[in-house]
Amino acid sequence: MFVRRWLSLLLGMLLAGCGSAEPTPTPAITIIFLATPTPQPTPTPTPVPVKTIWVDPALPAGLHQALMQRLSAFVEQASTPARRLVLTESPDADVRVTVGRAGAPLITHTLAVAAPFPTVPDGLAFEQLRRFWAGQPDALTSLSDQAGIAPTLFLDGDAHAALTLLLGQPAASPNIQVVAPQDVLPLAWQNRPAAFAVLPFDRLEVRWKLLHVDGVNLFEREAPIDAYPLTLSIRAQGDPEVVDEIAAALPAMDNRDLSKMAIVAMTGVTALVRGTAVRMEQKGITYPAEKIRDWLVTADVTHISNEVSFWDKCPPPSFSSGVVMCSDPRYIELLRYVGTDVVELTGNHLWDYGYQRLIPTLEMYEREGWRYFGGGRDLADALRPLTMTVNGNRLAFIGCNWFGANWAKENLPGSAPCSPGDPRDLSYQVETIRRLRAEGYNVIATLQYEEYYFYESTLRQRRDFAALREAGAVVVNGSQGHHVQGFDISAEGFIHWGTGNIFFGDQTFSKGAQTTMVDRHVFYDNRYLGVDLRTAFIQDLSQPVPMNPDERAALLRTLFNVSLFR
């Protein structure tokens, strides 16, 4: 019974299913077989090559710092993804920057040996300096002249480091004093005459006297610098490729770059007349300059103060021609021979044969390509300063005739009065100097002053010359000085009250009038560094001859004794 009921139920369910819609077909199943990836090795980064640069820490601190700054900028700019450059403290580097003779020059640093200006000796031997440094201070007793005292060397830390690189470690000595840079000069002056200093060439100034070392004078353009023993040559050495890149990127630095130097030779009285002219006729027109020509032609600017006009009808010279003067135009050959560049016209004999002689004289100078100042075709021309730029140094010359006679007028040629309304009033010169100084010029001012036949200056002379320096002149020159006179030296500039005759030699009544000085002023990077004094005696009524060492020392002692040092 139970079985029959179950079968009936199952049959009913089947019949009910037959009445529904067609069934949804079952979708086909697609089977995709994926390949198993083959594992790839992780790439190893290629190391970037590194080149190292080492800067010697023993270099003077100022130079070391300058190099580090320049090289830091270089490594940043020159590094690439393919090569890095780094500065290192390890001397075991690809490139070493240090003192040496090999490699690419980066810095040439010249040291100067100097003493206070009123020092009589002109130089020393390098061997003496080496012995002094090694602990023998008596090796340089000659620097104190007749005192015979072992001197003290004053220098700052950078100069000490530089000398240590050149000479080795110094001996412990009270005669070697390392002081602050600003104290070197005042301490040397306080301890003169037994004191000297070593400092960078470009830090010289007028209160120092540059000393020669083994006869090498750094104030000479032609100085054999390769023979000078106190020059640091800092070079890059090592990997040639990197060294070449450094040399191309970092222009070499030189603190005695001749392209930045200007030498101006200032001279005393020229008057090609009387005994001097007689000797020129007898022995040749260039005879007076033959012994000192090199002092003049090696300057960048050679100054001549010619007090006399040329005239083609000038009477033949004689020893008794007196004080009315003219010169044969042929004598201009002497001025050519010494390399004249600038002619001063403050002299008081330009009109001796009439003002008409001056214009043709000026035309002669212009044909030679020479420039003039302190006089001119008229008042405006005479008062006009002469300006020029020499190797980047801005120079200005200004001069006036304080003493008198042949002053230029509005329509007459002549020498420049010191002021248009009053030839002895210096206010016009002072204002002009101030203006030129404000414009960046190194002003050289000259005065045709009252003539004195003694070494000392007068109170009025000291006052008037100092007024021009106080206005801004770095050099003040007494062009009137038939007799050589002393100096006034201060931080503001150099005054020479009288340089003496040069090509005017028959004033035989006075030894001082037979003495001449050529003041070779040195400018560097538009700054006045100081003066190189040349000394001579005029012989044979006409010819300056360089003094021997004893004669020169005697003259310097005389002049220093009557000079002012501030």
Report each predicted region and the residues it spans:
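Acidic, metal/ion-coordinating pockets
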Residues: 247-566
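Bacterial N-terminal signal peptides that target proteins for export
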Residues: 1-7
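Ser/Thr-rich, Proline-interspersed low-complexity disordered segments
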Residues: 10-13, 17-50, 561, 565-566
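Flexible loop/hinge segments at secondary-structure junctions
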Residues: 47-254
